Regions:
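ATP/NTP phosphate-donor binding region
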Residues: 1-59, 69
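Short Gly/Thr/Asp-enriched flexible loops that form oxyanion-binding sites at enzyme active sites
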Residues: 67-80
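Gly/Ser/Thr-rich active-site loops/lids in small-molecule metabolic enzymes
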Residues: 148-156, 200, 206-227
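Glycine-rich beta-strand-to-loop/alpha-helix junction loops that act as flexible
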Residues: 8, 62-64, 87
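Catalytic core of DAGKc-family lipid kinases
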Residues: 3, 29, 77-188
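A generic structural signal for short beta-strands and their flanking turns/coil linkers
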Residues: 169-173, 186-188, 211-216, 250-252
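Glycine-rich phosphate/pyrophosphate-binding beta-alpha loops
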Residues: 133, 137, 191-205, 269
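ATP/nucleoside-binding phosphotransfer catalytic cores, i.e., glycine-rich phosphate-binding loops
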Residues: 15, 177-179, 184, 209, ...
């Protein structure tokens, strides 16, 4: 049996209509499905847990990166197969997984695909599937949250970028990778990447792979404020890792410390003083999309 988990506000309400189409497609395969609607923070995880305990062998998540993150966390080391149907604004995990942009095409491509085990990250015990980190991109997300009451999603994000560009300051961080020596650095951005993209397509970790058993740890040290606007086109193209602007290290564990630091966890913002990351290799069962 399939569980179809949907964030009803995702995609301006279009996600619910999409969930009905997905359920009809499952029925056409001769399979049963149950629809679970999320209603708030943490509800996707609770609904996923209930679905698996009810005997669902496949879980379809319709939503953005935040909902996908919650569902994936509950499916770590479970027998259920995870299907992702992009229904958010950024859809960065869907990019990393090379899913078609069309939601139904994305679902069909996974139905036709071969089983695959992908890695999952954890930060202080909380799961993420794509990217976590701190710095410039998090400052933009914080500003976006402030502006959402005035502007719709994408417009709020664009205005937040322009606002943060003019005032962003690097943060002081302590970093330890795979239990090695602790370094003290002024950082513009630090990303612990399982996937490749943040912010709706910025290729912050262009060489990251979801199933290689490693994080790509991307560190951009402090850069002059006048050069910060140049980071955006570099991130979009993935050039920052090619020209020496960023340091990239492959790792299985990372510890980052900074006083009163805000960390992005697949779009969810958390305030911590220490973030300890560990990779769970091959923890989530999926179907590799057949394109």
């Amino acid at each position: 049996m399939f569980a179809v988990i949907v964030n009803p506000v995702s995609g301006g309400g279009e996600a619910v209509r999409l969930a009905i189409r997905i359920s009809e497609r499952i029925a056409a395969m001769g399979q049963e499905s149950r629809l679970f609607e999320t209603s708030g923070d943490g509800d996707a995880a609770r609904q996923t847990r209930a679905a698996v305990e009810a005997g669902c062998e496949a879980v379809v998540c319709i939503g953005g990166d935040g909902t996908i993150c919650e569902v994936a966390g509950e499916l770590c080391h479970r027998d259920a197969t995870f299907y992702v149907v992009p229904g958010g604004t950024g859809n960065d995990f869907a990019r990393a997984f090379h899913l078609p942009k069309d939601p139904m095409a994305a679902f069909e491509s996974q139905l036709a695909g071969e089983p695959i085990q992908i890695d999952c990250g954890r930060m202080n015990g909380k799961s993420f599937l794509n990217v976590s980190g701190s710095g410039f991109d998090v400052a933009v997300l914080e500003k976006t949250e402030e502006l959402k009451a005035v502007y719709p999603g994408e417009k709020a994000y664009r205005k937040a970028v322009l606002s943060v560009l003019g005032r962003y300051k690097a943060f002081e961080a302590e970093l330890s990778i795979d239990g090695g020596e602790t370094t003290h650095e002024a950082c513009t951005i630090v990303e612990i990447a399982n996937g490749q993209c943040i912010g709706g397509g910025m290729r912050v970790a262009p060489d990251a792979k979801l199933d290689d058993g490693y994080f790509d740890v991307v560190v951009v040290k402090k850069v002059p404020r006048l050069l910060i606007p140049l980071l955006l086109p570099m991130f979009m193209m993935g050039w920052h890792t090619k020209i020496g602007l960023a340091r990239v290290t492959r790792a299985k564990t990372v510890t980052m410390r900074a006083k009163n630091m805000t960390v992005n966890l697949d779009g969810k913002l958390l305030r911590v003083d220490e973030a300890h990351y560990e990779l769970l290799p091959g923890a989530v069962r999926m179907k590799k999309p057949r394109l």
